[in-house]
C-alpha cells in the first residue's frame, strides 16, 4: 500500500503521544521515523517502529531522558545517553561532533548507555550535508555468530561513512551480509536474498531470509573479515565511551539497550579547497562508473547514491508500506 509522508508521521505521532511522550519529543521522533521511511530505508523506519514502541513500553527507552556530557578533551567528548530516545540522541551527538570539528578540524563523541539509533546512515548523511565527512558506528546485543561458531557472540555493529560529494556518497553497512531489518524486508516481500546471507539448520549457506531470522545464524560480511571488524568496532566503542560491550549488553540486560556508539565529523575544507575537493571526488566517481560492465543491464553503483532517487520517487508516488506492518501500527 501507499501512504503519504504526512500520514506516516501522524500515525507515529499518535502512538507516541498515547504512550505518554511529550508533544515536542513525539513530533521530533515521528519526523525522524517518517524521514527514514521516505528515504527508502523501510527496515529501520516504519518496519522498526512497533519494536521501538515495545521497548518504550518495557521501560528500556526513557522518553524524557536527556544525554549528559561526562568528559571533554578538546576534540573528543564522552557522553551518557541515559537511555534516551535513540534516534533523537544520535542526531544531537553528530551535531555535537560537527561543532567540535568546526573548532578543531575533527570532532569525536563517544556515547554510552544509548538506545538503538534506527537508521545509522541518517547521522553520516547529516554531517555530509554540511560539508563534513561523517563516520559513526554502534555496538548491539549479540545477534551474530563469530566466524567458526554456531552461537551468537558478536553484534552486527553497523558502520557508516559518508562523504560530501555531489550527490553524497555513503556506506551504511552492518558487519553481517544483511541486517536483520533487511532480512525482514525480503521475507515480507516473499523474496530470496540476492546472495547467501546465513546458514540453514544443517550448516549450509542459504538465501532464505526466514530461516536465518529464526535460527540467527546470520553470515558475517566477508566471512571472517566481518567477524573481525565487528569485534574491533565493539572494542573501540566500549573503550572510548566507557560503556557496555556486546558481551555486557547481552549478558546483563533483558534486551538491547544501554549500548555504546561513536560519532566522528571531519571538516574537509580545513585540508583542501572546495574546487579541488569537488574535482578529486568527481574523478573518483567517474573512474569507477566508467568501468566495463559485467552486465549491460546493470549499472555500476556508487554507495548511497540510490537514496537521492528513492527519496524523489517516494515524494512523487507515495511511500510503500507493507500491509501487515501498517496494520500493526494502526493497532498500537
From Swiss-Prot:
UniProt binding sites for NAD(+): 168-174, 224-225, 304-306
Keyword NAD: yes
Oxidoreductase among keywords: yes
Broad class of enzyme this protein falls into: oxidoreductase
Gene Ontology cellular component annotations, sorted alphabetically: cytoplasm
Subcellular location as annotated: Cytoplasm
Family (UniProt): Belongs to the LDH2/MDH2 oxidoreductase family. DlgD subfamily.
Name of this chain's protein: 2,3-diketo-L-gulonate reductase
Organism annotation: Escherichia coli O127:H6 (strain E2348/69 / EPEC)
